[in-house]
Amino acid sequence: MSLEEVGFIRLPGGEDTGFDHADTYLVPSGSRLYVAHTATDAVDVIDCRTNAYLRSLPDLPGVAGVLIDTASDLLFTSDRAAARVSIFRCSDESLVAQVAVGSRPNGLAFDTQRRHLYSFNLGEPPGTNCTASVVAVDDHRVLKTIALPGRPRWAVFDRSNDRVYVNIQDPAIILAIDARELKESRRINVGAKGPHGLGLADGRLFCAADGNELAIIERFAGDPQIVSRLPLRGSPDVVMHDERRRCLFVAIGSPAS
């Protein structure tokens, strides 16, 4: 099925400016959506009840990644043009710290057990010397830099087996990082061009690849294995799991008819 447009929210900068990652802060007092508005170097804040623009968090050069952990009351951004990550207290949107990381930070993942933020960096020029910076959130410093085999994309932390998974565009793999040892532990061959969006649900990884395919990977039983492949109507981006409806949504910018 496809979603239907039901409304439009006007944001600063006009209709044709670029956006990137987004995440939600879900609390009973009023949930909010935070959207990386890359073209305006800001994160736009939207009221989820009224579908109204509230304000922007400014001075985030080239902001790309947005990640929220509601339980920890933390909002993270990757400020690509500044080669840093920013850490906010989400409830009042106050800036806690800014930490320098590798060149052109992009996707983010948060180890909730150790309070380590993983910043996946595209390198300079993009796609060369790619790294993951592991940031100690409470100490506001980089603990370790991990070399990556290619350009990173979306990433997730899996608390159940203490791994961080990140899509690598080329080679077409999902890289697993041991969150305790802070080192690469496994490479999962996706078997489709350009792993892009990545989700985790019910003990499975869902990898949306540029080759118009969704790979479903079981990663509990020994070596992770692809258990199913589903065709997509175009080149995908982010994936989102709706736990209540048990549905996985895959964003496709230009779907085929």
Residue ranges and their predicted role:
Residues 1-257:
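Predominantly soluble domains enriched in secretory-pathway, periplasmic, or organellar proteins
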